[in-house]
Amino acid sequence: MYAVVRTGGKQYKVSEGDFLKVEKLEGAVGDTVNLSEVLMVGGDKVAIGTPLVPSASVVGKIVEQGKDKKILVFKSKRRKDSRKLNGHRQLRTILKIEKINA
């Protein structure tokens, strides 16, 4: 069985036992997270939401909280010798999908 969930403005296809790297979610390591924005549930029967599947949810456990790799943002103005270099590390959460309720 699999599901398509929406979190952090992105959509992810998940199955039970998968590890999922998402935008930062509130909670400590070991806490349980309920993802209620389920767009589709597949398996023996396929249920497609309009836009969400009613009474469907995905339960996950927070495995790790941390930051992604650094990305560099470089801005310059042509012919002005004006340059700006910034670094950014996005906060992220790693979940282990435990159960899909459909």
Curated annotation (Swiss-Prot):
Q: Write out the GO cellular component annotations.
A: cytoplasm; ribonucleoprotein complex; ribosome
Q: Is rRNA-binding a UniProt keyword of this protein?
A: yes
Organism domain of life: Bacteria
Keyword annotations: Ribonucleoprotein, Ribosomal protein, RNA-binding, rRNA-binding
Q: Which GO terms describe its molecular function?
A: rRNA binding; structural constituent of ribosome
Q: Which GO terms describe its biological process?
A: translation
Per its UniProt record, what NCBIfam families does this chain match?
L21 (TIGR00061)
Assembly description: Part of the 50S ribosomal subunit. Contacts protein L20.
Its biological function? This protein binds to 23S rRNA in the presence of protein L20.
Per the record, the similarity remark reads: Belongs to the bacterial ribosomal protein bL21 family.
This chain belongs to the protein called Large ribosomal subunit protein bL21
Organism per entry: Geotalea daltonii (strain DSM 22248 / JCM 15807 / FRC-32)
What are the leading ranks of the lineage? Answer: Bacteria, Pseudomonadati, Thermodesulfobacteriota, Desulfuromonadia, Geobacterales
